């Protein structure tokens, strides 16, 4: 069975480098927020062309701390899409804020037109969380412009889109603050949980840095309320310091595979794969949009050919039983997409033979 991902497919150099780093870190006796973390923060800030990067324990923590750093709290309204897996919602509800949902475009990204409409007619929105879903950067520049004109903070959730870029900058450089996940399956993945925050604003960065460690300004001196214990460890940072040097090549390999999948679908007018061939897309996931009612049939075709599939994501946030959804409004595009999405394997260590087998399955879709 071709898996959705296989994290064990490491090169000899990668494996040896990780073991060597692990040995050095163990011997150093410095395991949390040490020299490797400091180096990674500098490397990430340089890559994004922003002034500040703050390493944290996970992408979800990055969202939570970012919202708190902007002063978002209980009773505030935060705009987000309902189709991005619930990660932004988790952070929004954890700080006591309420979501207002913005519909998406046909590729799953936040609709700037719908955001503009909501900003003009809805209760005061304090922040927008824009998730760059599937590896696309979406309408980041227009969303940033809408937020700036309305005096609304913009949080870019770049968990799936590190390295995606427009002519004017990278994902993570348009908002007031941006968040990253380095969960192992991400384009830039660690070997455990890890995340980061990036911002051009020094004051916001100082708040985020304090909030990641209890709200301390110095050891045992609390200057910010609602602090967390969210620190990146040295091993994760050492892995990320190596892998960030290769992120553009990793993203290019992902795009090359996506292009082959897209070409394999050229004979089908009813099935498409989300993405585009260019720097605005880093091919985090291979997401098909299937005809209404045909997803199960196509899923079975892949299963019969020994190819794993998934759904990103099967339940919209406002349909989740565990969320208090707050200001619910219709999101017809998101609702239509959710029942039609099917994810196929797309990761950089797919073998050429596996890519051919997946392309064969795509070419065999007859709807």
Task: Show where each model-derived region lies.
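Helix C-cap/helix->beta junction micro-motif
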Residues: 95, 149-150, 305
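Conserved coil-to-alpha-helix start sites within the AMP-binding
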Residues: 83-89
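Phosphate-binding glycine-rich loop
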Residues: 30-77, 91-95, 101
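PLP-dependent aminotransferase class I/II
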Residues: 7, 37-42, 50-53, 113, ...
């Amino acid at each position: 069975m071709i898996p959705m991902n296989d994290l064990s497919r490491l090169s000899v150099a990668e494996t040896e480098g990780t073991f060597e780093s692990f040995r050095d870190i163990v011997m150093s006796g410095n395991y949390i927020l040490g020299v490797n973390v400091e180096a990674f923060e500098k490397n990430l800030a340089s890559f994004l062309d922003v002034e500040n990067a703050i390493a944290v324990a996970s992408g979800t923590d990055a969202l939570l701390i970012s919202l708190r750093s902007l002063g978002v709290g209980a009773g505030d309204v935060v705009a987000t899409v309902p189709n991005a897996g619930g990660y932004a919602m988790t952070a929004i509800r954890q700080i006591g804020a309420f979501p207002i949902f913005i519909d998406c475009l046909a590729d799953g990204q936040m609709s700037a037109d719908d955001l503009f409409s909501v900003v003009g007619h809805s209760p005061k929105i304090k922040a927008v969380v824009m998730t760059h879903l599937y590896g696309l950067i979406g309408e980041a520049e227009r969303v940033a412009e809408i937020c700036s004109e309305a005096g609304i903070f913009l949080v870019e959730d770049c968990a799936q889109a590190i390295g995606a870029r427009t002519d004017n900058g990278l994902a993570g450089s348009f908002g007031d603050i941006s968040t990253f996940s380095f969960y192992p399956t991400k384009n830039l993945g660690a070997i455990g949980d890890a995340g980061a925050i990036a911002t051009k604003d020094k004051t916001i960065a100082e708040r985020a840095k304090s909030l990641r460690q209890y709200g301390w300004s110095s050891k045992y001196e609390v200057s910010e309320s609602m602090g967390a214990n969210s620190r990146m460890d040295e091993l994760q940072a050492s892995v990320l310091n190596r892998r960030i040097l290769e992120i553009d090549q990793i993203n290019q390999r992902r795009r090359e595979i996506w292009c082959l999948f897209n070409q394999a679908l050229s004979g089908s007018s009813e099935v498409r794969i989300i993405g585009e061939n260019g720097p605005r897309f880093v091919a985090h996931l291979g997401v098909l949009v299937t005809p209404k009612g045909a997803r199960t049939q196509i899923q079975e075709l892949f299963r019969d050919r020994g190819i794993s599939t998934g759904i990103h994501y099967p339940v919209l946030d406002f349909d989740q039983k565990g969320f208090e959804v707050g200001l619910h409004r219709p999101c017809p595009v998101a609702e239509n997409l959710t029942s039609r999405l099917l994810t196929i394997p797309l990761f950089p260590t797919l073998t050429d033979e596996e890519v051919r087998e997946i392309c064969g399955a795509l070419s065999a879709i007859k709807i």
